[in-house]
């Protein structure tokens, strides 16, 4: 049973985030996890980023599961166990694998992970988080060339938080938007979306606050809340700009939301095609995601 044969059917979603170091993978996944859970989604979080010990998913999500060992072969075996568990028990999951030569890359070399999971009715969603540098496309190019880890459900996230202050997003992402690897991914069914910038991201994450707690003015680990106007910035980003981003992502590519207006019917094929045209970033009106 192939994913593209049952486009209208909801399947267990495995969202895997990849990219170079310091492009904002964990920041993206943390924001997405918080937003989806705030809208009623239920899923497991797998934190296999062993290189990032100070800012990882386990800091913000106490239920995140981690491998018991840092040894790459142990982590590889742990990932295989998680995948089997997902197939058997049919739940959604998000995986933060980190950067570099990851255990996931080693597993992919051993077995066709995507094809195996898709044959078992799991929708594998590969998320490439990139900044405006061409080198940020290394993972996308490599996976596409090898054809080992290139599912149809490929999401390219252009991290607006990596654009220098005062620079136009259109200009900043113009080269990567026109890159052959990005265009090939779109032709293959991929979707390109820009993550809106939250200028005070570090003010929230350094305090180990959730975005909702930051809006409510709750104190962080340092005993202080975010500043007054930063609270307003977070509210605008959380309540207006993030929902706009999610509207461009096919709903079947995400864990199912059950609360609020974003718990919408699956995105139509026609609308999905429109979303793919988001490869050309929006202008400066949005406000940034941090780095890993």
For the regions a language model picked out, list residue spans one by one.
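Hydrophobic anchor at the beta1->P-loop junction of P-loop NTPases
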Residues: 17
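Walker A (P-loop) phosphate-binding loop of P-loop NTPases
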Residues: 21-22
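Conserved lysine of the Walker
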Residues: 25
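Hydrophobic positions on the alpha1 helix immediately C-terminal to the Walker A/P-loop
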Residues: 28
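Short beta-strand-centered segment that lines the nucleotide-binding/catalytic pocket of NTP-utilizing
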Residues: 40-54
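Switch II (G3) loop of P-loop NTPases
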Residues: 91-107
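Conserved catalytic-core segment of NTP-binding enzymes
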Residues: 103-196, 201-204
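Beta-strand-loop-alpha "switch" segments that mediate conformational coupling across diverse proteins
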Residues: 175-236, 240
């Amino acid at each position: 049973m192939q994913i593209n044969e049952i486009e209208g059917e909801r399947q267990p979603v495995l969202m895997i985030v990849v990219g170079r170091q310091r492009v904002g993978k964990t920041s993206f996944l943390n924001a997405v996890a918080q937003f989806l859970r705030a809208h009623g989604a239920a899923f497991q979080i797998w934190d296999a980023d062993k290189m990032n010990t100070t800012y990882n998913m386990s800091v913000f999500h106490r239920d995140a599961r981690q491998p018991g060992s840092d040894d790459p072969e142990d982590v590889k075996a742990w990932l295989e166990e998680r995948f089997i568990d997902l197939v058997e028990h049919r739940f959604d999951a998000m995986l933060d694998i980190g950067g570099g030569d990851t255990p996931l890359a080693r597993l992919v070399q051993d077995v066709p992970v995507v094809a195996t999971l898709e044959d078992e009715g799991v929708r594998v969603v590969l998320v490439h988080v990139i900044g405006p540098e061409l080198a940020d496309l290394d993972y996308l190019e490599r996976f596409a060339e090898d054809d080992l880890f290139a599912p149809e459900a490929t999401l390219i996230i252009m991290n607006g938080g990596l654009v220098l202050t005062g620079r136009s997003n259109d200009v900043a992402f113009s080269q990567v938007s026109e890159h052959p690897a990005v265009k090939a991914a779109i032709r293959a069914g991929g979707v390109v979306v820009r993550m809106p910038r939250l200028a005070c991201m570090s003010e929230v994450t350094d305090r180990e606050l959730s975005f909702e707690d930051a809006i409510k003015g709750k104190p962080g680990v340092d005993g202080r809340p975010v500043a007054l106007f930063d609270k307003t910035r977070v509210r605008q980003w959380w309540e207006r700009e993030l929902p706009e981003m999610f509207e461009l992502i096919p709903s079947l590519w995400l864990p199912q939301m059950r609360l609020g207006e974003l718990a919408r019917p699956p995105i139509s094929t026609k609308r999905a095609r429109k979303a793919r045209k988001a490869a050309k970033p929006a202008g400066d009106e949005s406000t940034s995601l941090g780095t890993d």
